[in-house]
């Protein structure tokens, strides 16, 4: 993970990031990452229930619950750090 993080930090712009992640991940993996990020954003806004978020994004409540756990109680708090920067 450490080496991958170092490489990600070398990306210079959105285009490079998109190209890199399209090479690195399958379309299914990219969709899963995008889905989790969308869930995190909606949870952070705190305006919808888990079921509403799952229905809106056409994802499972399991995914919503997992992302919610990382937002609220996991030690890394990576979602929150970025969400605070962009809001």
Per-segment meaning from a language model:
Residues 63-64:
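Helix-turn-helix DNA-binding helix
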